[in-house]
Regions:
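Alpha-helical scaffolding within the catalytic cores
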Residues: 64-71, 93-99, 163-167
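Bacterial N-terminal signal peptides
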Residues: 7-20
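An acidic, glycine-rich "communication" segment
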Residues: 36-37, 45, 119-211
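Short alpha-beta junction capping motif
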Residues: 29, 81-121
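Active-site-proximal beta-strand/loop segments in catalytic clefts of secreted hydrolases
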Residues: 32-35, 72, 84-87, 106, ...
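Loop/turn elements at helix/coil->beta-strand transitions in domains of secreted/extracellular proteins
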Residues: 25-27, 77-82, 105-110, 133, ...
Length: 212
């Protein structure tokens, strides 16, 4: 049917756009803007600090400019990684949900950092993107914890929140992790400038290492 062909073409174009961006040799991370009233703009120093850490410590070629991009915009296909945070409500229109789905199916990646309070809004919002998927807790043996820096016990605990253990959840599409969600952890706060939260240096470094 025409809608199925259109969706297939959209996914193909998304994959091509991401591959073209990656072939240029300079990656760029963006902060994803969403509707619903939640503070998508929280932690303004977080992602720039992560980018600087990756470039300085790992020699990665990430563009230091971190733009904000609307979830419903075709511009999201320019960025291989989108970062999301906030404390409050998240809503996606049908067009926004389809756009984000095509982005993720086409090769994009979404990181969500629980800035304390986002959980009850994030889960139903992502259900509009992937109705067929549920967030699953990733085991400590998952490769996400064993990249450039090793985290044998999973996510580091950065902020207290409810005093619960930090957990990493994922949405897995056809065997590929398309969304990683840090819960009761707050990596984003850990990436921020020291004078924002006054986190101990070891917490700041652990958060950056996990992000990298």
């Amino acid at each position: 049917s025409h809608p199925m062909i259109a969706r297939a073409l959209s996914t193909l174009l998304a994959a091509c756009a991401l591959l073209a961006t990656q072939a240029q040799g300079t990656y760029q991370i963006a902060v994803m803007k969403y509707n619903g009233g939640g503070d998508w703009y929280a932690n303004p120093t977080a992602v720039p600090n992560l980018v600087k850490f990756c470039n300085d410590q790992l020699g990665m070629d990430i563009n230091p400019d971190v733009p904000n991009v609307d979830v419903g915009s075709p511009d999201i296909f320019t960025y291989p990684w989108l970062d999301v945070t906030g404390h409050g409500n998240i809503t996606f229109s049908p067009q926004e949900a389809e756009n984000l789905r095509n982005y993720l199916i086409g090769g994009g990646f979404l990181h969500v950092s629980d800035n304390y309070g986002i959980d009850k809004f994030l889960r139903p919002a992502m259900k509009t993107v992937f109705p067929e998927l549920d967030f699953v807790e990733l085991p400590f043996a998952h490769p996400v914890y064993h990249q450039k820096f090793d985290f044998p016990h999973g996510l580091p605990k950065i902020h207290y929140h409810d005093g619960l253990p930090a957990q990493g959840f994922g949405l897995i599409w056809q065997g590929r992790l398309v969304c990683f969600y840090d819960y009761q952890c707050d990596l984003g706060d850990g990436w921020e400038d020291h004078d924002v939260h006054n986190d101990p240096p070891e917490k700041h470094i652990a958060a950056l290492q996990m992000g990298a």
